[in-house]
């Protein structure tokens, strides 16, 4: 061992490695990939997109709610982006978390040119992302929260 040498080793793979290898991280990555392969990527995607469609169908006609994106496009990510009236997306996200315990992402999502194209550069959007681990009940609760919040905010 040459732990205290002032020159980094030149031989491979040591030249590319510093410190102790992240063995726990590698084991977790291996287990995660194994689980994905066992479940089937297509099966997981179908479930996630079904949850996103369920949410979309429940919020798309709610007064004051604007949903962005085409849910018929395939393949697509299980994401629904929306706004409530002219409310700032960060305010909507804060209320969803504080009052309903629903975690979403608000803002420009590192896509400023898309927001310019959508006309949401100032407001941003509220992004709901669904995963295999969400339940239909959670999706319905999120949709009910959006509808209730829209009624509340539009009456202010």
Residue ranges and their predicted role:
Residues 1-156:
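Pyridoxal 5′-phosphate
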